Structures are given as structure tokens and as C-alpha cells.
């Protein structure tokens, strides 16, 4: 086994070797024991969703499925994905997505894209805003509109990137719920290429 982080300056050895406490998983960083209402991805429980979230509420839940991606600068690929939309009673949705690359036979190859962010009601009826951060060094602000009670369209208003990130200049996304499943398509403009199809997936509700 490699040396890893043990003994690295600034990383306490006790923190790395602390035994598990047992019992239920307290969640990332022990968030479950904070003196705050827990967020939920299930509209059947507490807390009550904020009234301003009404146009976004069909998204609340945990969704999992598969998708396909491609771009002129890369080979086509298949991926699995889980997406979670949750709320804590305030007027925004907490969004998190994790994806993994799949082989031709459906086996999991390795972790892929991750996203975290917030979906917020906009200034006018039927409008909303989305803030997303990516570990690839990209941060995006989207402006969106409700196309129907179960369809949401959003396009980037701002794309900011770290000095080491690849060039991404714009994205457009369309989400829709069809026959109980969450479908989406993503168009991307990046690395000198114009806006064009990049991702498409179908996710089934697994919780909420």
C-alpha cells in the first residue's frame, strides 16, 4: 500500500486512522446531527416545500438511469447517472449529479462527471435560475423558463472557468418528465466548436 496521506504535513494522523463509530451513516460531514431541518427529496414528508418552488416541484426526487454522449473532439460514450433534487423548505432546490462511464457490455468503468448547484425561482412567473459548479473548473449560471408544467429549458447566461479548465463558452439544457421518467438533452459550445448536441439521458425515479 502506498504512503497516501499519512504523515503529510497538515493532515492529522488521528483523523486518518479514526475507527468508524458504528450506527447509521450520519451523512457527508455529519450533516444529519446539525440543529437544522433536514433537506428532503421526498415531497410526501416534511418540511413543506416553499410556494415559490411550485414550477420546479416535479423535479424533486432521486433519479437514476443511463445516457449517451458525444462531441466532435471526443469518442462517443455511454454513462450511468444519478441526479438528486432536494429542498429544505426555502425557495430553492439543492441539485447534485454523479455519473460513471459504462463499457459496451454495461459494466462500470470509472467515475465521470459531477455537478452540484441550486435551482431558484426567477424574477417573473415561469422563469428560474440555475447555478452549477463542476470539478473540472467550470461554474455556470443558467436562465431558464418553464415550457410546460413538466418541461424546463435553460441556457447559460454566464460561464466562468479556472485557468486550468478547458474552454466552455455555452450550454443549453432541456429537461422533461415523460411517462414518469426524467429525460434531458444537453447542447454544448466548447473548445472552438459551436453549440451542438453533447448529452442525452433517461432517468427513472428511484426515490421521492
Q: Can you describe what each PLM-predicted range is?
A:
Residues 76-80, 111, 166-169:
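Amphipathic hydrophobic-ligand
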Residues 65, 93-97, 127-132, 152-156, ...:
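Short hydrophobic/aromatic-rich beta-strand segments that constitute the beta-sheet cores
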Residues 103-143:
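Helix-adjacent hinge/juxtasegments
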Residues 98-103, 133-139, 159-160, 187-192:
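Short, solvent-exposed aromatic-acidic interface loops
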Residues 135-140, 146-149, 153-172:
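Acidic, glycine-rich flexible loop segments
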Residues 80-86, 115-120, 141-145, 170-176, ...:
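Hydrophobic/aromatic beta-strand elements that line small-molecule binding cavities or substrate pockets
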Residues 162-208:
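Mixed-charge, glycine-accented linear interaction segment located at domain edges/termini
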Residues 1-92, 100-107, 191, 195-208:
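Amphipathic/hydrophobic helical signal segments and adjacent flexible N-terminal regions
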